[in-house]
Amino acid sequence: MNLSRFASRLRMAEEISKTKVGSSSTASVADSSAAASAATNAAKSRWKILWPNSLRWIPTSTDYIIAAEKRLLSILKTPYVQEQVSIGSGPPGSKIRWFRSTSNESRYINTVTFDAKEGAPTLVMVHGYGASQGFFFRNFDALASRFRVIAIDQLGWGGSSRPDFTCRSTEETEAWFIDSFEEWRKAQNLSNFILLGHSFGGYVAAKYALKHPEHVQHLILVGSAGFSAEADAKSEWLTKFRATWKGAVLNHLWESNFTPQKLVRGLGPWGPGLVNRYTTARFGAHSEGTGLTEEEAKLLTDYVYHTLAAKASGELCLKYIFSFGAFARKPLLQSASEWKVPTTFIYGMNDWMNYQGAVEARKSMKVPCEIIRVPQGGHFVFIDNPIGFHSAVLYACRKFISQDSSHDQQLLDGLRLV
């Protein structure tokens, strides 16, 4: 009996000892874990101190782009609706490249629509290469007073979806933009509208009007790209330049589809600084007209960075549409005689796009055509001189808008009809 009680007490002592050891071990592990966590946080804090904000990578995505867009458009007075309009996946068996994808990624076009008076004509605005619809921020309020303004980001740009770019020819690349725009039109149930395109957006707008003239009431091409081919131009200088080592390198980069956006992405944390230097110089110190305010410059820079740094998609069209030197592979000049839509060309006086291309096109066109040059404006005439630009647009559309304002029927002083 005594031996039994002794054995029982011995087992109890062993269990108590194990429990104490286990508790001590658990506490030790917990303490070690807490210490490790504290050390990690301290290391992160020291890293943040040692690694300045200027060297930290700034993330981007479609959500960041839309947020930057909303901040930029917050300075406007006219209410608007922003939506991502689904354009589907195309008809079964479609041979159009932009319909094809190995993923189930949705296709949508980022769209902003501004409030307008009942019965106002619809004006659809299409941005140029390397831009997005927010670039028209200085124009929306004024134009929305006379039009139902709708601005879009083309497929693969801005806040629109960015599918993998699989085009391998000029025809496929044109279809990427023209046919996706047509699917957007169907989704929006638009039958007739005035179509305005800037730069590369002008090229797309003109090609769309050639294919679907029944939907376009009037075509407005602002500093439009794509009128001249290398063979049409006095390109002796380009031939000589290509023969130099610099020309050979740049031509190789072009044919390799090296885009400005790739440079912004490749610079990582230095990318925003590069964009800031560009917007500050182009729309500030070196502005052709009215420079941006400090607030406008800050908001536009943030917006431009996010649109450029996002996934590469539509930007990869460059080498398929243009050859080195920005000469069109399928120039609009060659199809000018086929145009069925009345057209107005608008150029800044200092636009690097040569308005003589429009002059030559007009000689072959069988529809009404006007060419307007706006003073104090460069390639981004709608930012440089918004008042002059608005006058040119209203004059171009004088037959579609109400006649209650006589100044819409004439150009402001300084604007020139060519």
From Swiss-Prot:
Catalysed transformations (reactions): a 1-acyl-sn-glycero-3-phosphate + an acyl-CoA = a 1,2-diacyl-sn-glycero-3-phosphate + CoA
Entries under InterPro entries matching the protein: AB_hydrolase_1, AB_hydrolase_fold
Motif (GXSXG): 197-201
Domain (AB hydrolase-1): residue spans on this chain: 121-251
GO CC terms in record: cytoplasm
Effect of disrupting the coding gene: Accumulation of neutral lipid droplets with marked increase in absolute triacylglycerol levels in leaf mesophyll cells.
Motif (HXXXXD motif): 379-384
Name of this chain's protein: 1-acylglycerol-3-phosphate O-acyltransferase
Organism listed in the record: Arabidopsis thaliana (Mouse-ear cress)
